[in-house]
Amino acid sequence: MKTAHEIRPGNVIMLDGSPWVVQKTETTRSGRNAAIVKLKLKNLLLNSGTETTFKGEDKLEDIVLDRLDCTYSYFADPMYVFMDAEYNQYDVEAENLGDAAAYIVDGMEETCQVTFYDGKAISVEMPTTIVREVIYTEPSARGDTSGKVMKPATITGGGTVSVADFVKVGDKIEIDTRTGEFKKRV
């Protein structure tokens, strides 16, 4: 058990019988009253989010989930199948992938972290950065060079990313999977 004040982003807490990952914490202190902790949470079973507040001294059940490095194997509708180093396969429902689904492609070499709760694979965390090829984007507009000009681009896997104006179809780009932002051309 931890107090709400000790909870940090990345911790997993048990709330109303479900595991919730803490995405953001904000502590507010006032002169007379105790500290209030505002938490932004994501339900690992339902893939939904919420914000809630606690008093700084409130006790919360902190849980540790099993995580395993795996590689993407194949898609069997509606499940994505991942495999660990010992060739054990784990099914993750497509709805539990969230934003990660846009970055998963056949033959990808990046290792993902599969999270387990009660022996069941419930979510997948992509590496911080990945490299994908641009399969469609509009050509650059001539003369539009003032400031940081961005345009939408479709990448392998079907996701859409805002990229710099100089990026063309066929370019490989590095993407930050936490924010979905273009980092650089590779």
From Swiss-Prot:
CDD domains: S1_EF-P_repeat_1, S1_EF-P_repeat_2
Keywords on record: Cytoplasm, Elongation factor, Protein biosynthesis
Pathway: Protein biosynthesis; polypeptide chain elongation
Keyword Glycoprotein among record annotations: no
Gene3D superfamilies: 2.30.30.30, Nucleic acid-binding proteins
GO molecular function, one term: translation elongation factor activity
Superkingdom, natural source: Bacteria
Protein family according to the UniProt entry: Belongs to the elongation factor P family.
Entry-linked PANTHER family: ELONGATION FACTOR P (PTHR30053), ELONGATION FACTOR P (EF-P) FAMILY PROTEIN (PTHR30053:SF12)
Protein name: Elongation factor P
Organism: Shewanella sp. (strain W3-18-1)
